Swiss-Prot record:
Family annotation (SMART domains): 7TM_GPCR_Srsx
Gene transcribed to yield this protein: galr2a
The protein's name: Galanin receptor 2a
Major localisation: membrane
Gene Ontology biological process terms from the UniProt entry: neuropeptide signaling pathway
Species whose genome carries this gene: Danio rerio
Residue spans crossing the bilayer: 24-44, 55-75, 95-115, 136-156, 180-200, 231-251, 269-289
Expressing tissues: Expressed in neurons in the ventral area of the interpeduncular nucleus (IPN) where expression often overlaps with spx1.
Superkingdom of the organism of origin: Eukaryota
Alphabetized GO MF terms: G protein-coupled peptide receptor activity; galanin receptor activity
InterPro entries on file: Galanin_rcpt (IPR000405), GPCR_Rhodpsn (IPR000276), GPCR_Rhodpsn_7TM (IPR017452)
Intracellular or extracellular location(s): Membrane
C-alpha cells in the first residue's frame, strides 16, 4: 500500500470515528439537558428548597451539570470532529474555564452534601440548628467561590494559536507551569474531595448498619434518610469513577509513557467522554432510586402535556369550549396545582364574555 492509499484509509477511518463521537456527544447533550432541567423543575415546583438543605445541594449539583452540558459539551465535540478551532480566542479561554469551574463546583458540592448527610444521620436532633437552608446557601456560595478561585487560572491556560496555517485552541503555558497546574487540579479537584467523601460516607454507612435501634422496626424517618444517603452515595461514586480516567490520562502524560499516537488519542477521547457523561447520569440515578423524583418527573411531564393540549385549542364554539375546559380541568387536577387551574378558569370566563370564539394560552 502506497502513501496516498494509507492517507485515504486513515482519513476514512477517522471520518467514521468522528461520526460516532458526534453521536455520543449529541446523546450526552440531549439526555443531560432534559434530565437536569427535569431535576431543577421538580425541586423548584415542589418548593422544598426552603425546608431541606439536601435539596439545595442537589439543586446546585444539577445547575452545575446543566451549565457544563450546555456551554461545554457542544464546543468540546467540535475539537474531535472539526479540523480547526472556529469559535475565536475568547471562547477558547472561556470553555475550558467553565469545564473546570463546573467540575470543581460538582465535586465540592458532593463533599458538602456528604457532610450534610453524615450530620443528618449521626446527629439528627443536634444538627437541625446547623443544617438550615440559610447555612446550606452559605455553603453553596463558598463552593462557587472556591471553584472560581481554583479554575480562574484556566482563563490563561489555553490560547488560540495558528500552527502551520491551522487555527487551534491549545495550552499556552510553559511545560513546568502546565505540569504544576495539572497536579494541583488533581489534588484539589479530585484527590482531597474524594478522601472527604470516602471518610464521611464510610462513617455514615458504619453508623447506619451498626447502630442499635430501640424499636423493632426502623422508623419511616430513618428509612427515608437511608434512601437519600444511598442515592447521594451512588452519585458520588459515579462522579469519582467517571472523572478518574481523565485525571489518570493527564498524570500518565506527565509521569508515564504516553506517546502521541492513534491509541493514546483514542484513550484521551474516551476519558473525556466518560467524564462528560457523568453530567447526564445524576437524573437517571434520581429516577431509579428516589420515589420522590419519579413522582415529580411524572407530574412535570403530566402538566407539560396537558398545557400543550390546552394551548392547541383555538377558535372553539362556546358550548364546546365549556365542555373541553371542564374535561381539561378535571384531568389536570391530579397533576397540576390549584393556581394553574384558577388561572385557566379566570382566563376562559373573560374571553367567553367578549367573543363567541376562544383562544387558550395557558402558561
Amino acid at each position: 500500500m502506497n502513501a496516498s492509499q494509507q492517507i485515504h484509509v486513515f482519513s476514512s477511518h477517522w471520518k467514521v470515528e468522528s461520526v460516532i463521537i458526534s453521536l455520543i456527544f449529541s446523546m450526552i447533550f440531549l439526555v443531560g439537558t432534559v434530565g437536569n432541567c427535569l431535576v431543577l423543575a421538580v425541586l423548584i415546583r415542589n418548593g422544598q428548597m426552603n425546608t431541606k438543605s439536601t435539596n439545595l445541594f442537589i439543586l446546585n449539583l444539577g445547575l452545575a451539570d446543566l451549565c457544563f452540558i450546555v456551554f461545554c459539551v457542544p464546543l468540546q465535540a467540535t475539537i474531535y470532529t472539526m479540523d480547526e478551532w472556529v469559535f475565536g480566542a475568547f471562547v477558547c479561554k472561556a470553555v475550558h474555564f467553565i469545564i473546570y469551574l463546573t467540575m470543581y463546583a460538582s465535586i465540592f458540592t458532593l463533599a458538602a452534601v456528604s457532610l450534610d448527610r453524615y450530620l443528618a444521620i449521626r446527629y439528627p436532633l443536634r444538627s437541625r440548628e446547623t443544617r438550615t437552608p440559610r447555612n446550606a446557601l452559605t455553603s453553596i456560595s463558598l463552593v462557587w467561590a472556591l471553584s472560581l478561585f481554583f479554575s480562574s487560572p484556566y482563563l490563561s491556560y489555553y490560547q488560540q494559536m495558528d500552527l502551520d496555517g491551522t487555527t487551534v485552541c491549545i495550552p499556552a503555558w510553559s511545560v513546568h507551569h502546565r505540569q504544576a497546574m495539572d497536579i494541583c487540579t488533581f489534588i484539589f479537584g479530585y484527590l482531597i474531595p474524594v478522601l472527604i467523601l470516602g471518610i464521611t460516607y464510610a462513617r455514615t454507612i458504619r453508623y447506619l448498619w451498626t447502630s442499635v435501634d430501640p424499636m423493632q422496626d426502623m422508623s419511616e424517618s430513618r428509612k427515608a434518610k437511608r434512601k437519600v444517603t444511598k442515592m447521594i452515595i451512588i452519585v458520588a461514586v459515579l462522579f469519582c469513577l467517571c472523572w478518574l480516567p481523565h485525571h489518570l490520562v493527564i498524570l500518565c502524560m506527565w509521569f508515564g509513557h504516553f506517546p502521541l499516537n492513534h491509541t493514546t488519542y483514542v484513550l484521551r477521547i474516551l476519558s473525556h467522554l466518560v467524564a462528560y457523561a457523568n453530567s447526564c447520569l445524576n437524573p437517571i440515578v434520581y429516577a431509579l432510586v428516589s420515589k420522590h423524583f419519579r413522582k415529580g418527573f411524572k407530574k412535570v411531564f403530566g402538566c407539560a402535556f396537558r398545557n400543550r393540549v390546552v394551548n392547541r385549542i383555538h377558535t372553539v364554539q362556546p358550548a364546546q369550549t365549556v365542555s373541553l375546559m371542564e374535561a381539561a380541568s378535571s384531568e389536570g387536577s391530579n397533576h397540576c396545582d390549584g393556581s394553574t387551574r384558577g388561572r385557566l378558569w379566570s382566563k376562559s370566563s373573560k374571553k367567553m364574555m367578549t367573543s363567541a370564539f376562544m383562544t387558550f394560552n395557558v402558561t
